[in-house]
């Protein structure tokens, strides 16, 4: 049985509207990209700063998730979405 990892990933983007559009449900969406490896995401943004964004991700396989982020598809998605990669932070759920 695979243990699901819950992660909070937050980052700044150049244009929150562009980032949000990439996450709209439908063909080619970021939801579809992550669903290929079984990841489900929920989207968030700061109501006073739409360029401060994030996702909560349910990740069944962290190695596959990291591979996707580093793949050509993942890097292209970040570039197209205007993600400021240097601002990206990820917290994973743990039990102390």
Where are the language model's segments positioned?
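Short S/T/G/P-rich N-terminal loop/turn motif that feeds into the first structured element of a domain
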Residues: 1-77, 81-96
């Amino acid at each position: 049985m695979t243990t699901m990892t819950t992660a909070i990933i937050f980052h700044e983007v150049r244009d929150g509207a562009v980032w949000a559009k990439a996450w709209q449900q439908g063909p080619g969406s970021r939801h579809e990209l992550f669903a290929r490896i079984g990841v489900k995401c929920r989207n968030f943004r700061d109501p006073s700063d739409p360029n401060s964004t994030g996702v909560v991700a349910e990740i069944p396989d962290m190695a596959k998730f990291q591979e996707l982020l580093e793949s050509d598809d993942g890097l292209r998605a970040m570039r197209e979405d205007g993600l400021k990669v240097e601002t990206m932070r990820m917290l994973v759920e743990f039990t102390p």
